[in-house]
């Protein structure tokens, strides 16, 4: 049901009250863990960087301590764009400029630095444990490795990695394979985070022979507001005026977290004039004969079990805006599940390509933190 979808506290939904006993217990947990938190820096304070900070701020008992942000715009831009967001609305937190190199979020001070060269960042002197790499630029071993050269211990790339030997993780699918010795990891793409969980269910329950995917995806900052030069001639066209066919590696990338599917999936993207929330349309041939109700039952079992909080099954006839700021990686539109000839399965799944993805970045960062303090 729509009412069951998890919403963040700072999108306007009510927060349930806790008893005094529970509140004291929660504070005790925080006190115990405080000295064990890892120090986190965000490199690139764009859409994912700011969504990540809001998601992190909404967590309780987190093992992450965000202490620095590298943003070329400085404190004025960082504080203003964090507080006021055209998609997310006004941040309920108290965001202030402390001085020319610090902002505060509900009293929590965060240092703002500005350098386009990761080698010049003060990660060593700040004892940074983990860098959230959110620029979309430093996504290979050489680029991301510059953060480690600058003194950070680890890097989490918020995009598909360019080097095959950088491990990729999708929470709900293969995060259990994470090892503390990995210096650089990738959280894959937002579309892979939507696709991989329910594809895993299909593979385990029915066996996938082959398939294709189309993601109808909200426009992103990589596109042009008006027609202008771009390496992709379709993305060169005005994003708010067109449906823009383009490439996506999301389907192929599923095999990075589900090796049994290597060579079995492919797909394309259609960029559309909406600011956030996208939808995947997957068609696969399966080995085991099935029917729509059985497919949805498999999704419900996963949503109530091992993929709780990552996968959601929606029965109401909703539209894209209804999925804005949903915490899950993927919301199956149950009424649109189809089976043709008992072995061709069509699944439609919604996802907030900014918010839901950023929640998984926080989750994966927490996975690394738990290995640190174990």
Swiss-Prot record:
Binding site for NADP(+): 47-48, 71, 116, 353
MF annotations from Gene Ontology: glyceraldehyde-3-phosphate dehydrogenase (NADP+) (phosphorylating) activity; identical protein binding; kinase binding; NAD binding; NADP binding
Disulfide bonds: 55-325
Entry's localization field: Plastid, Chloroplast
Predominant place of localization: plastid
Active-site residues annotated for this sequence: 190
Sequence positions that bind D-glyceraldehyde 3-phosphate: 189-191, 220, 235, 248-249, 271
Transmembrane region(s): none
Site feature: Activates thiol group during catalysis: 217
EC number annotated for this UniProt entry: 1.2.1.13
Keywords assigned: Calvin cycle, Chloroplast, Disulfide bond, NADP, Oxidoreductase, Plastid, Transit peptide
Annotated organelle transit peptide span: 1-34
This protein's GO CC annotations: chloroplast; supramolecular complex
Enzymatic reactions: D-glyceraldehyde 3-phosphate + phosphate + NADP(+) = (2R)-3-phospho-glyceroyl phosphate + NADPH + H(+)
GO BP annotation list: glucose metabolic process; reductive pentose-phosphate cycle
SUPFAM superfamilies linked to this entry: Glyceraldehyde-3-phosphate dehydrogenase-like, C-terminal domain, NAD(P)-binding Rossmann-fold domains
Family statement: Belongs to the glyceraldehyde-3-phosphate dehydrogenase family.
Assembly with partners or alone: Homotetramer. Component of a complex that contains two dimers of PRK, two tetramers of GAPDH and CP12. CP12 associates with GAPDH, causing its conformation to change. This GAPDH/CP12 complex binds PRK to form a half-complex (one unit). This unit probably dimerizes due partially to interactions between the enzymes of each unit.
Miscellaneous note of the record: GAPDHB, the second subunit found in plants, is absent in algae.
PANTHER family: GLYCERALDEHYDE-3-PHOSPHATE DEHYDROGENASE 2 (PTHR43148)
Record-given protein name: Glyceraldehyde-3-phosphate dehydrogenase A, chloroplastic
Organism name: Chlamydomonas reinhardtii
């Amino acid at each position: 049901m729509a009412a069951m979808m998890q919403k963040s506290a700072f999108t306007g939904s009510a927060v349930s009250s806790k008893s005094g006993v529970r509140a004291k217990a929660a504070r005790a947990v925080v006190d115990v863990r405080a000295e064990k938190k890892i120090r986190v820096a965000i490199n690139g304070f764009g859409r994912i960087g700011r969504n990540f900070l809001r998601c992190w701020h909404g967590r309780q008992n987190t093992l992450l301590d965000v202490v620095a942000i590298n943003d070329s715009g400085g404190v004025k831009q960082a504080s203003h764009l964090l507080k006021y967001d055209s998609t997310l609305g006004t941040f309920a937190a108290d965001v202030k400029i402390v001085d020319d190199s610090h902002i505060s979020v509900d009293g929590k001070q965060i240092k703002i630095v500005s350098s386009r060269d990761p080698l010049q960042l003060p990660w060593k002197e700040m004892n940074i444990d983990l860098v959230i790499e959110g620029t979309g630029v430093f996504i290979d071993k050489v680029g991301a490795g510059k953060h480690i050269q600058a003194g950070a211990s680890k890097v989490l790339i918020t995009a598909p990695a360019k080097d095959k030997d950088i491990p990729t993780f999708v929470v709900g699918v293969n995060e259990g394979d994470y090892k503390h010795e990995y210096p650089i990891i990738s959280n894959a793409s937002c579309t892979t985070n939507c696709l991989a969980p329910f594809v895993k269910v299909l593979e385990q329950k029915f066996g996938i022979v082959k398939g294709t995917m189309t993601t109808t995806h909200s426009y992103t900052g990589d596109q042009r507001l008006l027609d202008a030069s771009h390496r992709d001639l379709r993305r060169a066209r005005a994003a708010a005026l067109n449906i823009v066919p383009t490439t996506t590696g999301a389907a192929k990338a599923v095999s990075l977290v589900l090796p049994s599917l290597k060579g079995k999936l492919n797909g394309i993207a259609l960029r559309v004039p909406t600011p956030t929330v996208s939808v995947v349309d997957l068609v696969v041939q399966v080995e085991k004969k099935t029917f729509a109700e059985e497919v949805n039952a498999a999704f419900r079992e996963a949503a109530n079990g091992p993929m709780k909080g990552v996968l959601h099954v929606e029965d109401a006839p909703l539209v894209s805006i209804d999925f804005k700021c949903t915490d899950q990686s993927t919301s199956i539109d149950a009424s649109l599940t189809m089976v043709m000839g008992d072995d061709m399965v069509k699944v439609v799944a919604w996802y907030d390509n900014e918010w839901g993805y950023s929640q998984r970045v926080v989750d994966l960062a927490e996975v690394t933190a738990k290995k640190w303090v174990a």
